[in-house]
Amino acid sequence: MSQLSAPGAENTRRLLAMALGSVGVVYGDIGTSPLYAFREALRPVSHDGVTDVEIVGLISLMIWALTIIVTIKYVLFLLRADNQGEGGTLSLLALLMKTANGHTAILFFMGIAGAALFIGDAMITPALSVLSAVEGLKLVTPALSDYVVPIAVVILLFLFAVQSKGTAAVSKFFGPITLVWFLVMGAVGFMHIADDLSIFRAFNPYYAVAFLFNEGYVGIVVLGAVFLTVTGAEALYADLGHFGRRPIQWAWFTVVFPALTLNYLGQGAFVLKNPEAMSDPFFLMFPKWALLPAVILATAATIIASQAVITGAFSLTRQAIHLGFLPRMAIFHTSETHTGQIYLPNVNTLLMFGVMALVFIFGSSESLATAYGISVTGAMVVTTVLAFEFLRMRWNWPAWWAAGVLLPLFALELVFLGANMLKIHDGGYVPILIAATFIVIMWTWKRGTAILHTKTRHIDIPLERFIKSIERQSEHAPVSVPGTAIFLTSDPESTPAALLHNIKHNHVLHQQNFILTIRTANTPKVPREERVSARRLSERFTLMEVRFGFMETQNVSQALGLFRKSGLKFDIMSTSFYLGRRKLVPDAQSGMPHWQDRLFIALANAAIDPSDYFRLPTNRVVELGSHVII
């Protein structure tokens, strides 16, 4: 009997371990919302005093926002809409692009808009969450008020400084620390529910709807703050591949949702009894002796939440690079065992300067909270639209049935988006500017590479025609030299520019010549047996193809070993890799505005060398340059 139950016990332990890990990574962001969400929701209605019904209505809005948007949309539905186990906007986009018929451009812009909004979120979340936690020091002693921003800056600078070292050593503590945070939140909320048991009326959605109807315009403004309760919900979907659906769902229903609900109920009951606590209900719920430990624990929780968002930005950027939305960047692995732990120095630096700018410009979590909701609501609307396409294309639902399921969610999210748009003049323009910048960058790169490909195709020589001409015996034939040459190309049907330049300038042709194309699949990973393929074109020329998933490291040197196992004979350390380096020159007839030409060329010049990106042996790489008018 014990032998039969052993696998079940092992599976249970694994589920619990994964669920604990997801508490630290997936739910870190949404778990810090109680620090400021209820406080910010109270501000628009607190000028003339807040009635008991208004407080109950606010808490009801928060609980039902968590129920409808997070529980129903993300936890129960979207976690099933995966791309071979991976979630997130770009993963969903990659899946849909495979079967899109005639409206790929719309899907592309929706996808990059969602990705760009997430980058804005990745800048605002660390600044807002760390500031909101450190501000608790003002309640410990007012003498520390002037030190809130400097302390937050030091914490954030340290967080970005350690990214290059990796988080493998400390990440095992993220889950337990965040679990303690949720337990403490739930406990302190539960203790204060007894302050006014009428807060249980918040479970009745009537009070949420009545609040909106009675408050009118102010109610719409309040919705922008209420939405802060669900910020971080996108992380559930984006981190699907790291933990899996069941652990994320299990953690939500057993720990996170109950703790958040208890805390918001407790804050509501506490303010019902103590109206003067509206200035900071979360920290004021703690007794004086527990305030400093609560601030320290909150700071630790916000650091973990910030780390999760930064890691998410790294992962999303890698996906965008592999899908051809961004130029190649340096990607370093910070763990030998966890392939998902990566470090992108360019992205880290960009996020650091962005976060620092937000901290110094806004100076407080109250000011920064007004800028927060737009990026998150925008990303959620994008995800809902992509989910509609997923239901139609992948699950083969009729359009009317898919619309019937998602339209209520879409309408609700549009209401939240409209409420957040009212805050544009108070700082809401910041995430819009950040997102617009990255949309332009990704659109320019995608558009520029397409134009460049079209232009080079017109002047390229078909590969098979070239092989026939070069292998004819004539006095102009290049000198045959021993050894192997691998020529990288993005178009296997055309002759690589590096091969043409090698013959033109060096007048030599190697005994073995491999034309290598590197493909990125629309799936997260490519099975080992489908990684490589080869086709012999002639005695001296072979066409090779290496395929990677958009979540994989594109280590070409490692993949070439699979060719040798399949029978192709060559020694990688005696093989020369020939790469073409293009010097791009703008052209008035490029098809893009002049400013976009310049931006595309700047992006191309900033891209990391292919030899570094594809992990080629640097002492075996030969680069041959050419001018290309774009």
UniProtKB/Swiss-Prot annotation:
It comes from the Bacteria. One of its GO terms (cellular component) is plasma membrane. This is Probable potassium transport system protein Kup 1. The gene is kup1. The chain crosses the membrane at residues 15-35, 58-78, 104-124, 142-162, 173-193, 208-228, 252-272, 290-310, 342-362, 368-388, 399-419, 424-444. Disulfide bonds: none annotated. It is a multi-pass membrane protein. It is found in: Cell inner membrane. Belongs to the HAK/KUP transporter (TC 2.A.72) family. The keyword Membrane applies. It catalyses: K(+)(in) + H(+)(in) = K(+)(out) + H(+)(out). Keywords: Cell inner membrane, Cell membrane, Ion transport, Membrane, Potassium, Potassium transport, Symport, Transmembrane, Transmembrane helix, Transport. InterPro entries: K+_transporter, K_trans_C, K_trans_N, Kup. Pfam families: K_trans, K_trans_C. Transport of potassium into the cell. Likely operates as a K(+):H(+) symporter. GO terms for molecular function: potassium ion transmembrane transporter activity; symporter activity.
